[in-house]
Structure formats: structure tokens, C-alpha cells
């Protein structure tokens, strides 16, 4: 009986194929991960998180992760789409210290090519702000983000968010309201695109190489 069970046992790993996952074209289609699957259809929808530093070489941003989702497989090669980014909780905690005021902004926005997003921003001021001043800061930030999103495609916005210019631009936007120096777009999430229906797929998360 034991021998029969042994003969009938299959090595599931040997039945799987390893697929190469690549970044979107606006990030050079570089290889970002390898993942096994029994069928290429099972790769669709899998998520991969990659440090921003892997793309920019800026190791100060190694705690910021870009998030991709597999959208198509050809042979053993799988292409992805950008679906957001996130900054580690430890990085945000280090930003906020005692006697500092934290301002959180969570806002919806839309790119010029119709992608809907939620963007989360955290700012830290050196002193407590009045209610009016906080309102001015929020209004300026929301107006700035909506203007940038509305003037960019999703690939352009993704590159902008993970780059260095966005920080300087926000500081410049706020200089006439309050000189806030600690700013982070801590998370972005793509919700969908106008006129498109998202197809369900696997939701496995894959570690980048």
C-alpha cells in the first residue's frame, strides 16, 4: 500500500514552469522577478513589489516600493502594469516626532488618460498650525496633485511620483502658505480606468529578485 502511494505521488514543483516577470515599458521592461505556475493563465493578476532604488539608483528610497501586477504572458515572459506605490511605515514614523504636527491628506484623482487613483500624502510641520492654516495647506496640496494628475498619463505620473522632483514641487507650492519641509506621498493606488472593466485574476504577491 505504501509503495502504491509513493508511485502515485507527483512532484508539483516539477510540473510548474518558471516565468520571467518584467517591468512596464516606461521603466525599461527590465526583469524584476521569477515566479512558478502550472499554467500561464495563473500568472495573470499576480503582484510584484520592487524597491524604487532598483530603478532610480537612489538608495535613500529603498523603503519605497513600486507595485506592479501581471497583465499578460507570452511564452515564459510576463508583462506588468503599474498599480501603485507605498512608503514603509517605519519611514513615516521617523518623519513624525514629538512636538511636530502631522497632516494627512487622502484624495481621489484622475490622470489625463482616464486612470482613477487614490493618493495619500503626509506632511509634518515644525509647529502646530491653526485650523485656517491647515485648511490652506490641504487646499494647496489637493489643487497641486489634481493639476499634475490631470496633465499626465499614468506612466508619466508613476515616474513623477517615484522621482525626486515631486518633493521640490510640493515645497515650492507651499512656500507662500507655510514652509513645510517634511513631505511624503506615502501611497498611491490605481483603482481602474474609465471605460474599462478589470478582469479578475490571481492575487499572489511575489517578492522581487
UniProtKB/Swiss-Prot annotation:
InterPro entries: Ribosomal_eS1, Ribosomal_eS1_arc
A family per Pfam: Ribosomal_S3Ae
Any one GO biological process: translation
Keyword Membrane recorded: no
Leader sequence segment: none
One MF term in the entry's GO annotations: structural constituent of ribosome
GO cellular component: ribonucleoprotein complex; ribosome
Keywords: Ribonucleoprotein, Ribosomal protein
Family: Belongs to the eukaryotic ribosomal protein eS1 family.
NCBIfam families noted in UniProt: PRK04057.1
Protein name per its UniProtKB record: Small ribosomal subunit protein eS1
Amino acid at each position: 500500500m505504501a509503495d502504491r502511494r509513493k508511485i502515485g505521488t507527483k512532484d508539483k514543483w516539477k510540473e510548474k514552469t518558471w516565468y520571467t516577470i518584467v517591468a512596464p515599458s516606461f521603466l525599461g521592461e527590465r526583469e524584476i522577478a521569477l515566479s512558478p505556475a502550472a499554467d500561464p493563465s495563473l500568472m495573470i493578476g499576480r503582484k510584484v513589489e520592487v524597491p524604487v532604488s532598483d530603478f532610480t539608483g537612489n538608495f535613500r528610497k529603498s523603503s519605497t516600493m513600486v507595485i506592479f501586477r501581471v497583465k499578460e504572458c507570452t511564452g515564459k515572459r510576463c508583462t506588468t502594469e503599474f498599480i501603485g506605490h507605498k512608503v514603509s511605515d517605519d519611514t513615516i514614523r521617523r518623519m513624525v516626532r514629538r512636538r511636530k504636527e502631522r497632516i494627512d491628506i487622502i484624495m481621489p484623482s484622475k490622470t489625463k488618460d482616464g486612470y482613477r487613483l487614490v493618493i495619500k500624502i503626509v506632511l509634518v510641520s515644525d509647529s502646530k498650525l491653526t485650523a485656517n492654516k491647515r485648511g490652506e495647506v490641504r487646499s494647496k496640496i489637493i489643487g497641486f496633485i489634481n493639476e499634475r494628475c490631470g496633465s499626465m498619463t499614468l506612466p508619466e505620473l508613476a515616474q513623477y511620483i517615484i522621482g525626486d522632483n515631486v518633493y521640490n514641487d510640493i515645497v515650492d507650492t507651499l512656500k507662500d502658505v507655510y514652509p513645510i519641509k517634511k513631505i511624503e506621498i506615502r501611497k498611491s493606488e490605481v483603482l481602474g480606468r474609465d471605460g474599462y472593466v478589470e478582469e479578475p485574476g490571481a492575487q499572489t504577491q511575489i517578492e522581487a529578485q
